[in-house]
Amino acid sequence: MNEGEVVLTPEQIQTLRGYASRGDTYGGWRYLANLGDRYADNAAAIVGKDTNLNGLNLWMKKGVENLWDDTVGKKTRLEKFDRVALQHFSQYVDLINKNNGRLPNTSEIERSYYKAVTYHGVSSSAAIDLVINRSLPDMADGYWALGLGIEAERIHNEQAVNNPNGSERDNRKQLISALDKGFDGSFKEKHFTFLQSVMMDLTKLGVEYTIDGWQKIGGWGNGIINDLYKSVVKREWTGIFEIVNNNIKQGNEAFKNEINSLVHDMKAAGKEFGDDLNTQWNNLTQAAEIIYNDIVDNTSQGIEKGVKAIKELSEKMKNAASDLADGSAEKAKQVVEDLAQAAKEAYENAKSTAEKAAQAAREFFKGLPSFKDLAEKFRDLFPNPEGWIDDGHQCFAPWVKETKKRNGKYHVYDPLALDLDGDGIETVATKGFSGSLFDHNRDGIRTATGWVAADDGLLVRDLNGNGIIDNGAELFGDNTKLADGSFAKHGYAALAELDSNGDNIINAADAAFQTLRVWQDLNQDGISQANELRTLEELGIQSLDLAYKDVNKNLGNGNTLAQQGSYTKTDGTTAKMGDLLLAADNLHSRFKDKVELTAEQAKAANLAGIGRLRDLREAAALSGDLANMLKAYSAAETKEAQLALLDNLIHKWAETDSNWGKKSPMRLSTDWTQTANEGIALTPSQVAQLKKNALVSLSDKAKAAIDAARDRIAVLDAYTGQDSSTLYYMSEEDALNIVKVTNDTYDHLAKNIYQNLLFQTRLQPYLNQISFKMENDTFTLDFSGLVQAFNHVKETNPQKAFVDLAEMLAYGELRSWYEGRRLMADYVEEAKKAGKFEDYQKVLGQETVALLAKTSGTQADDILQNVGFGHNKNVSLYGNDGNDTLIGGAGNDYLEGGSGSDTYVFGKGFGQDTVYNYDYATGRKDIIRFTDGITADMLTFTREGNHLLIKAKDDSGQVTVQSYFQNDGSGAYRIDEIHFDNGKVLDVATVKELVQQSTDGSDRLYAYQSGNTLNGGLGDDYLYGADGDDLLNGDAGNDSIYSGNGNDTLNGGEGNDALYGYNGNDALNGGEGNDHLNGEDGNDTLIGGAGNDYLEGGSGSDTYVFGKGFGQDTVYNYDYATGRKDIIRFTDGITADMLTFTREGNHLLIKAKDGSGQVTVQSYFQNDGSGAYRIDEIHFDNGKVLDVATVKELVQQSTDGSDRLYAYQSGNTLNGGLGDDYLYGADGDDLLNGDAGNDSIYSGNGNDTLDGGEGNDALYGYNGNDALNGGEGNDHLNGEDGNDTLIGGAGNDYLEGGSGSDTYVFGKGFGQDTVYNYDYATGRKDIIRFTDGITADMLTFTREGNHLLIKAKDDSGQVTVQSYFQNDGSGAYRIDEIHFDNGKVLDVATVKELVQQSTDGSDRLYAYQSGSTLNGGLGDDYLYGADGDDLLNGDAGNDSIYSGNGNDTLDGGEGNDALYGYNGNDALNGGEGNDHLNGEDGNDTLIGGAGNDYLEGGSGSDTYVFGKGFGQDTVYNYDYATGRKDIIRFTDGITADMLTFTREGNHLLIKAKDGSGQVTVQSYFQNDGSGAYRIDEIHFDNGKVLDVATVKKLVQQSTDGSDRLYAYQSGNTLNGGLGDDYLYGADGDDLLNGDAGNDSIYSGNGNDTLNGGEGNDALYGYNGNDVLNGGEGNDHLNGEDGNDTLIGGAGNDYLEGGSGSDTYVFGKGFGQDTVYNYHVDKNSDTMHFKGFKAADVHFIRSGSDLVLSASEQDNVRISGFFYGENHRVDTFVFDDAAISNPDFAKYINAGNNLVQSMSVFGSNTAATGGNVDANTQSVQQPLLVTPSA
């Protein structure tokens, strides 16, 4: 590579490809330019955005754009330039890649650009002509003139150099050289310097460059100077003259006619106003305010600034002219001087004009105290409020289209026109009021029309001689009346009447020739002026040829050339003449005559005329009905009142149409009439369809709809100028569609008229409350009176105030009336609280509500605010285009202004708002405005990232301006000014200063690009540097400090700080506290200071500095770069002998011997200290330096303590010595001696020897063939990979061989060792080797689970080989061979046989997968089956036998055994003893044998077998599977009659009648015997079988003893019979009879009947409505839930009703009963005395009880009756009366009155049958009622 040559790396090329993929050519070229590519520097300027460029770069870009425009045209440039640029850039990157990183040469660049240009559709010749394909490399080479496009064809070689045979490029370069010499040898240098200064001045002026400015200066003749002008001066000084000239033009235009310019500018901007100006008044006032402010700015600042700059520019131009000129460039000098003088004069003139206009404006506005006065001042400046017509134009479009289609005809205007400029007859479209209006059809109304362009003319004849072309009669076309009284078919037919000699030519020979004129409508207004009417002679026209052809050529813009002929000029040439069909727009119309109005009439509300209707005010002057209606409408005070009158107003205006009265019958017709100016709008097929459907009839519904629409059709005809006398339809659907379009259009019309009259009528009184102020030359509006006016109305009519304010805001666009929107929000909130909001919204209508709730603006100047009409309190507002005002209001809002000069308004309680203000346009001015008295001192200004945060100090709100500080506040997101309610304004510079001020809190401070000093002060601060050299002081607090691109100094100060360097050579000082320092790029210095710090140098040569008391610090020094030199430097007298150096993992630990600190250098020893984390040198304060090699030696030295020693890759011997040490091998063959202590030794990748020595050691092999010797102690050895030898030594050791063929060595006294030998590899051979004379007969071999136990018979040791028998000894855990010291070897098969031999002790024997017979013999043995069919005999002892997966036979033998089947169909025989049998899965057979056994079948169809003497056995048969069949089989002659079948709970009990045994089937009766526990069948030895149903019947049979009988769910009758029985009901309605005996009867869930019968019985109801009858005896009855009936019967009974409405029944001889009637529900309980009258019963209080006594033998005690209502009986029923709770409640509450009044019942008289005396009866009478039947 040559010196200075740029060569890119693959990574840099990949970065360039990223720019290409994103389409960012500017960024890509800038990236290349920064790498040193000169060509890229110029290319970036060519493709960059104007906003990215300035001075010379912008000049070059404009020059290149000129070249494109000159060569292929501006349109092609705009379409293809960016695509060509992107492809060229991509190809340029490909060339770099192809050249292995070298930059392309000039020829490669030219070919690349040529390919890019032609690829995108530019012709090859044009691509060659585009000097741009050579200009880019020329710029790179320094040939600036070629780069700006001196095209070859414009340079005469002989005038430059005498080299006609030279190449084009050489000649051009020589020309430049000659020019350079010709201009004093310094032309290029001076030119560059001068041009840059000029461009800077123009930039200061804020002007933009134009392309053709210099073309206004005339040519200089021929020769090199002319070429120089065209190619150089034009290109380089492009636009200077035009800039100056345009400014003059704009200034004059803005200030001409003084205040009248205000009106013109507003109209030019598209503002439309009415005579009264009360319509859209806000547009007027806002425009006036803006223009006035512009005037003031131009006079006080703008003009002075501009003149000063242009004067300086003029002087520079003069000086430059002198410097640049000598004899050959005199012309250039003169041009420059002329330009300078012109600029000076232009700006002096502009200044003078502006000052005069400003003064006039001041005087004008000072005299305007109110809006009303302003309106009067401007009344005569505006002819009509025409805007409403354009606003409503679209609403009429469907109607016009439909009527044209349905009346079958379209109308056009038909004049004759001449091509005057030779480029064909050109026309323009209709443009409403801004275009041509002409009275074609002679009705006195000028309507909008397509028109002939200004460079062509209409053939006309002034018939009445008034010098004006009045109407279509004076054109030649379909409105020309012929001699016979008819109208001409077209223009040629009209002209033919003037051919007096019949030669088919109109010339001087024809009498009328001299009367013909050509109207060239120069101003395109449709009104002929004298200078626009020219004779044929003046235009050199000799004759007009009447011959023509029908061409029907579409001219665009809705116009058609119908016929075309020609005319002849006096020079003999011909030109085109044609008959046009011009588009007609009847909507935009103006009456030609004017109605004079009285002063009173002139005050009426007004709308511009439309269609065939005059202006509303004029029409009212001619119609009394309309005038009265307009007056009434204007006087209506509410929206409802105006809407009620609106239809009538619309009709009365329509009735002033001269055509009114012609109804619009909708009828079917096939008779078509076509005149010269009408065409048929239907196709032939449609006409045929019409004829086919000629008899289409309409339904009554359709006819009714048509009748209702007739009147509206007439109205719309008047407003649109249409004629819908006959409308055609082809179906009922067509007819109904006409009705729909009619109604929709009418509704739109009504809405439009309503809205446009709003501010002239109902809302006008409010507007009159607005006043004007002039303060300090500032024009403002005062709305205070307007707020008062609305609040005054609200006091008496809240709905009117609400609706009026809403419509003023929706349609008035009061941009600066912020109070109005807040007032609306208040009204909304009040309406919502009052429940009126929905009603008010209905009055307003959907459109108005939508406008007030809208969140997105348009291209116009919009006002957006959430005033409560939206669904959400938090809204997002989008201004889009235009100068918008966005007011978030309450809530947390998102405001995005879009393009234009936008204003964001915030008042009190503005919430948590966000402003997104992206707008890259120049000249825009975006503002945040605080109102409601908010001033700057009430807010704080802070920065977060690039966002500006403006917070209210009282926490009432915050505004976040996103990306405000992009480009240091000069970017596209900035807010240009922040305005406060006291008039104070903050510009960007002031805001930037504010956000750098610190507080005592947690601040975020940001430096700018120029470099700053930031002080965090108190608090936990964030400080951010930028591109300059910054000083960032965190001061107190836990600070975060971020460097920028400069060489920054970061001081953390006090606290736990985080310091981050960046690209420069930074100095980071953490100060006090535990700090984090990160230098990142650059050669940084990091000083942690006091505290425990983390230091990260990043890339570059970094220095870490540690002084006294440096703390517990960590250094992370990752840097893979070559050539860097990182240093740790100890200061404050610290020397190496004051420190210790140790290693932990890859970390280096440098500790102070006095314990005052430690530095941990992370990963220092990666790659043995040669990796990316190393510290290259450690420096001490005495000058001593340690390099990496020295440090490596230091850290391998052991001590008497616990050391960590590491080998290096070359192989080492490490001795741990005393202490619990950690030794680590590396890649070499290491010898690692732990020596004394509990050591941990780790092998590396070599073949290492690890010796634990004394102590409990852990030895870990690694990849090599290692030798591990644990030595004394309980050691852990892990060989890992490789063929390792493991010697546990003395102690209880754990040996793990790992992968490879490993050998485990055991000698005398080997202890209790464990071998874990997992290795799934094939081909490995693992061995246990016994030494020291140990032979096989000295050991025993047993199995426990899958483990192999090898025990010394003398108990001196045991080796457990874990999982040896996995997969029957063929698994990954096996030991392949066991070697003994006598040479004997045991393989796996031999070992497997040894461990199946039983002893007289307790053995564990395991079957193998192939099937085995195991005999336990004596002892309590464990036998385990496997996958085969095994025979497992427990023999004597209490054995545990486990089946495997096969069909196994398990025999317990003697003893209490446990037998467990598994997956197969197993046979389990318990034998003698109390055994537990579990069949688990499969169809098993279970035989308990003698003893009391527990049998559990598990899943499958199981059989339980019982023979003689089977004992007390239990069957647990849970199995929920369907299809299973479980059986109990009795053998040995046992039959059913030898057994009893009873039920206990859900269990089935099968008992031998001789008492020899019992089988309990647990839960048999779950779900009435259909559950998962059932036995499906019981088989007997005589062949009899009992199914479940039979068993269920057997267990319900009673005996003479004490039975337990259970009902089933379906409902049963159970009879207990003799004995003390237990009867249980179920869910059905059961009858439960206890019969004789003391029975216990329990109801179920049904409505049960319980009869105790004889004896002392206990009856318990449950959930249903039960009947409980105790019968004879002393019974206990409890009804529990339900409405129960309790009958105690004979005896002394205890009755407890429970919950529900219960009835207690007592008959004669019921005995001494007790009722406990406690309840918490509201049910009613009754006590019924059958056979008793009320007088027979005594009521006696006994404590808290009530006793009802019929005799000494018969009485009832109601327990706790007087405790309260919960204990009472509600009603007492007797044979002759009933006493209810309401009757006696009042006596109870009165104390003892009840008992006193009833005490007679307790008298002896009553008891002996005496009568009740009269007094007692009188008290008792109210309590007695006749019982209900």
UniProtKB/Swiss-Prot annotation:
Segments annotated as Hemolysin-type calcium-binding repeats: 869-886, 887-904, 1015-1032, 1033-1050, 1051-1068, 1069-1086, 1087-1104, 1215-1232, 1233-1250, 1251-1268, 1269-1286, 1287-1304, 1415-1432, 1433-1450, 1451-1468, 1469-1486, 1487-1504, 1615-1632, 1633-1650, 1651-1668, 1669-1686, 1687-1704
Keyword list, A-Z: Calcium, Cell outer membrane, Membrane, Repeat, Secreted, Toxin, Virulence
GO cellular component: cell outer membrane; extracellular region
InterPro entries named in the record: Haemolys_ca-bd, Hemolysin-typ_Ca-bd_CS, Hemolysn_Ca-bd, RTX_toxin/Mannuronan_C5-epim, RTX_toxin_determinant-A, Serralysin-like_metalloprot_C, TSP_type-3_rpt
Pfam family, one: HemolysinCabind
Domain of life: Bacteria
Cell compartment(s), UniProt: Cell outer membrane; Secreted
GO MF, one annotated term: calcium ion binding
Topological category with respect to the lipid bilayer: Peripheral membrane protein
Role noted for this protein: May participate in the pathogenesis of meningococcal disease.
Similarity comment: family membership: Belongs to the RTX prokaryotic toxin (TC 1.C.11) family.
Domains as described in the record: The Gly-rich region is probably involved in binding calcium, which is required for target cell-binding or cytolytic activity.
Name of the featured protein: Iron-regulated protein FrpC
Protein's gene: frpC
